[in-house]
Curated annotation (Swiss-Prot):
Name of the molecule in the record: Alanine racemase
UniProt pathway: Amino-acid biosynthesis; D-alanine biosynthesis; D-alanine from L-alanine: step 1/1
SUPFAM superfamilies listed in its UniProt record: Alanine racemase C-terminal domain-like, PLP-binding barrel
Superkingdom of the organism of origin: Bacteria
The organism's taxonomic lineage, starting at the top: Bacteria, Pseudomonadati, Pseudomonadota, Gammaproteobacteria, Alteromonadales
One Gene Ontology molecular-function label: alanine racemase activity
Function: Catalyzes the interconversion of L-alanine and D-alanine. May also act on other amino acids.
Keywords, ordered alphabetically: Isomerase, Pyridoxal phosphate
Annotated catalytic residues: K35 (proton acceptor), Y255 (proton acceptor)
Residue positions where N6-(pyridoxal phosphate)lysine is found in the record: K35
Cofactor needs: pyridoxal 5'-phosphate
Amino acid sequence: MKPFPRAEISAQALKNNLSRLRQIAPNSSVMAVVKANGYGHGLLNVASCLTEADGFGLARLEEALALRAGGVKAKLVLLEGFFRQVDLTTLVEHGIDTVIHNEVQLDMLENASLSKPVTVWLKLDSGMHRLGFTPEQFAQVYARLEACPQVAKPINIMSHFACADEPDNPMTQEQLQVFEALTKNSKGYRTLANSAGTLYWPDSQADWIRPGIALYGVSPVIGDLGRNHGLEPAMKLVSQLIAVREHKAGQPVGYGCFWHAKADTRLGVVAIGYGDGYPRNAPEGTPVWVNGRRVPVVGRVSMDMLTVDLGIDAKDSIGDDVVLWGKELPVEEVAEHIGTIAYELVTKLTPRVAVCLD
C-alpha cells in the first residue's frame, strides 16, 4: 500500500529535463543545483538521477558531504562558501569547491594551512547586492587569490542574476555587461546563468549554467510553465480522500466557519494540511485534481486536512487519489493561486510527506 500524502518523484522527468537544458545551452557544462534537499525532491534521489550532470551546486557543507557519502564523485560547489576556517580542511579532504564572496573568507583562506590547494569560485556582485565583491573590489581580490598558495589555479568566477525571471527587466542586461567587462579575459571557468538566465538569456550561459528549479520541470518566471520550454514536472504531490460528505446549502465547513455552501453539494476531505507543508493561506478556489478534473479548495486548510467541493453530482469515493500538484495540475498554477512561488511549495514539504522515487 502506498503511503499518503506522498511526493512521487519521476526519475525520467529529471533525466529528460537535464537533457533538455543541455539542448538549450549546448556549449555549457551543467552545475545542477540540488540545495534545499534537492528542492524538496530528495537530495540523493536527484543526484542518483542526474549522474550525467557535470557537477552539483549546494548551499551547505552538510549537503555536499551527504553527496560524497552517497558515492557522488562529480564536482561539488558550495554556493555560499565556507563559514569556518576548519571547514577548509574538510573541503580539501573531500574535493569540494568553494565560493569566496567576502573579506572574512578571503582572510581565512590566506591564513589556512592546507595539504593541497582548494578550488575557488570568486563571487562578483554584478548588481544583486546580496553576496560578492563589488566591481571596484574585484581586481584586487582576484590578485590576492592569484597570489594565495592555498588556491588552485586558475580561479573561477561566478555571479548571480537579480531579475532574470522578469524577461523584460533591463537589470539583467546591465548585470551581463558588468560580468563580461570584468571577466572576459579570465582563464578559469565562468558561470552566471541560473534557470531563468539559461532559458531567457542565452548570452549569459558562459562555461557553466546553474539550473535549479528548471531541472525539476518548473518555470522560474511567474505566469509561465515549465512545459512551455520542453520541461516535465518531476514531482507529483498526492494524497487521498478520507471522507465524502453530503453538504447542505448555507452550511459552513472548517475552522472559523467562514465558507458557506451556496447550494447543496458534496465535500471531500483530503488527508493533507499545513503540517505536511501545504500552505494554510491557500484561498478558496485553489485547485486540486480529483478523478480527471479540477475541484476547488473550500474552507480553511487545517494541520492535517483540507476540504474540497466535489460538486453535487460527484461520484468520488473514500480512498480516491487527490493530486495537489503534478503533471495534471502544474505547481506554477497552484503557487499563483496561493500568492507564492513554486520554489516555496516544493521545498516546504515536511517529513510527514513520503518522498518516493519513481
